[in-house]
Amino acid sequence: MFALKKNEGFDRLLKMIGEQNEKNVDRSEEIEKILNSLKLTMKAWKTDTGIYSIIKYDKTALGLTQDDYASIGLLRSVVVDESGKIVSYSPPKSLNITAERETQFNLNNIMSPIGDDNTNEWDAEEFVEGTMINLFYSEKGNSWEVATKSTVGGNVTFFSPKNPKDTVEIREKDTFRNMFFETCKKVGVNYEEFPKEFMYSFVLQHPKNRIVLPITEEKIYITGLYTINQDTLEVNQLNRAGFIKNYCANAVLTPKPLFSVDYTVAGFKKEFASMNSPYNLMGVVFNNMITGERMKVRNPNYELVKNAKGTENKMMLQYLSLRHGGRVAEYLKSFPEYKTDYSVYRNSVHAFTKNLHQNYLDCFVFKKKPFAEFPQQYKKYMIQLNKKYIEELRENRNCVTFNYVMEFVNKIEPGALLFSLNYVVREHKTVIQRLEEPIEKVIDTATDTVEVKATTEETATATATDEPTPIEKEKEKEKEKQE
């Protein structure tokens, strides 16, 4: 249950909105004062079903802290009608995973494949890519209405058309509103049968609204289902599975549940949100089934592809070149406006270094899986590290430590390092290009790729097998003692 009155003055704000609209009393000054004090924004929208206001927390507000999100984060996207009544509610903002919250995760209180909703406090599910569409019933308009996070009516598009001449046509045909209702019809969702007192939050996937993933078919996921007590302003979260079973089985999807080997946050991150995770995993979302709290971890590879731009490569190469020469701090003294961007690039290099070291250990020391199964962008350097171990470190009984890998990465030529850091971006572009190619061309290209990949991995595997196992190392030490 979400207590919206936790935001002191929010109930008064709703009352002021109602008085201004229905009694024609000017409350704009008082409304603005409450919005500012609560760090909220509000925008009015007029549709065929009525006049609405979307209230959201202001991400740009001065002095906004993570602690504030526990209260104003409940107001991520709230739609109010002209009487001040809440008609639509979206899932609240996800909270940061703090050290205290991280201790809550273990096999005893997070859903496992054999877990029970009644005995586990948390569950983990895939972070679904798409556009949030909230559905609610308008009593005044006597029909169903939709809202996105920032608009009511959904008569907007996300991507601008490449051809300006197509603007009007595309806005009319490919709005979020049209795509949502067309998808409902295609997958067999009869929303006219839905309970009108519920507020619904969905994620829409549509081929015409591609964000990162190569979406080829329309899908609708339900992420939130709510009722509200208009007097107490308490929002109740309802069971999604039960709703689907009764009203839209085989039509509306729920995010896929995720399971980890050790059921810790670190375990989930490693499997679903690390530099080793494929870019087509957006991340993982943790849901508290008692309080309704949400926490999420984003996959850095997904974010890398999402934020990739033409000018981004030039800036990143510039950073890597300065870093290679030890001149980053000096450069930022003259151009401090690049500090934020450079921090992002630095974190990418650090994550790459950490994963390269772990992949080396998992492959050549712990033998967790075959060399061929490791991410392509690390293989070249894993082989080089193994070679250095054999030729330089083994004789002195030294091993490949994290500091050794850090120094190794610092010496990689900037262009080569950029190539590896951007591997998932190029992989994504290839997938998208193939979606748009004729099928005959895709088959020919795929055949050539398989042949080249097979040859490359055979060579790489042959090199990799030169690395001794831990048992072989112990035998070697015993042999040296005997001599």
Task: Map each language-model feature to its residues.
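Core nucleotide-handling region used for phosphoryl-transfer chemistry
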Residues: 1-483
